[in-house]
Amino acid sequence: MRTFSVPNTTRQSAEILAALEAHPAFRAATTVLLYHSLKDEVDTHEFIRKWSREKRILLPVVVGDDLELRLYTRPEDLKPGAYGIEEPTGELFTDYADIDFIVVPGVAFDRNGNRLGRGKGYYDRLLPRIPSAYKAGICFPFQLVEKVPAEPFDIRMDEIITQ
């Protein structure tokens, strides 16, 4: 995969997240499932802090082969979890029907809303449990490809937001 310089990805992350926060479905949402980004993903760290003042922000925690969702409270309550990802230690969240909007990470996306993850299937198992939430994939332009292989059971994104 292509790599970009830090200043370039920082600028691109800011532009992508500005488009995300202007999205009508995001603006209307009260409970949002985000992810704490890795170095090669759109940087969500400050975005999480910013919006946690106005919305209920959930983050995934890896537990075995699944993701459980926990309430984000503040940066000091994050701890390194699986794969070096910072994970919240806040309250366990199980009211999936209350989730209005999901920001989904991916290695690649296509314009049809298909997503390629990192191969562990965490989101493949999680997303079917949250069918009514609006699902937005966010990615750098080089992660948007012509076609992502998809199976009939794969959950498509409602929209891909990129620069």
Regions found by a protein language model. Name each.
Residues 68-163:
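Conserved phosphate- and dinucleotide-binding cores of soluble alpha/beta proteins
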Residues 1-97:
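N-terminal active-site beta-alpha-beta segment that forms phosphate/nucleotide-binding
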